[in-house]
From Swiss-Prot:
NCBIfam families for this protein: RNAse_H_YqgF
EC number: 3.1.-.-
Family indicated by similarity: Belongs to the YqgF nuclease family.
Name the UniProt record assigns to this protein: Putative pre-16S rRNA nuclease
The entry's keywords: Cytoplasm, Hydrolase, Nuclease, Ribosome biogenesis
Biological process terms in GO annotation: rRNA 5'-end processing
Source species, domain of life: Bacteria
Gene Ontology MF terms: nuclease activity
CDD domains: YqgF
Alphabetized Gene3D superfamilies for the sequence: YqgF/RNase H-like domain (3.30.420.140)
Length: 146
């Protein structure tokens, strides 16, 4: 089965998906949406599930904890989105992965690839989703329970 990961922001969401053997993470895309209107993300998730013929058995959400491990406003946003996902897709497990530093790693990877600033900005969330999913595939994550 496959895992679908998210790097969720207030106006963008980057997606990555695992291979069927759950060995590697592959970038999908980043979508833009109206600030804090996650219905567009749900619609995109439905498209991805259909595209991958219902082979996705888990969602992996980047969980933006502060460096001291405490929750922030963005963490609460992800908590609310996890509830939305759980209600919309009750048969799919949800895991939370500490995403601390994933954006910095993504920016470093994209800078090393010598992409333009415009390309870097458009790819950052997708690369972050890949990093989050790779972390999950290597180390696991915290299972989300309603």
């Amino acid at each position: 089965m496959r895992k679908l990961s998210f790097d969720l922001g207030t106006k963008t969401c980057g997606f990555a998906i695992s291979d069927i053997l759950e060995i590697s993470a592959n970038a999908l895309e980043t979508i833009r949406f109206v600030e804090n209107d996650f219905n567009a993300v749900i619609v995109k998730v439905k498209e991805i599930i259909k595209m991958y013929q219902n082979s996705i058995d888990a969602f992996v959400l980047g969980y933006p904890l502060r460096s001291n491990g405490s929750k922030s406003e963005r963490t609460m946003m992800v908590d609310n989105f996890a509830i939305l996902l759980a209600n919309e897709f009750p048969g799919i497990n949800i895991y939370l992965v500490d995403e601390y530093g994933s954006t910095i790693k993504a920016q470093r990877i994209l800078k090393d690839a010598k992409l333009s600033n415009k390309k870097t900005k458009s790819k950052k969330d997708t690369v972050s989703a890949v990093i989050i999913l790779n972390d999950f595939l290597q180390y696991g994550g915290q299972k989300y329970e309603l």
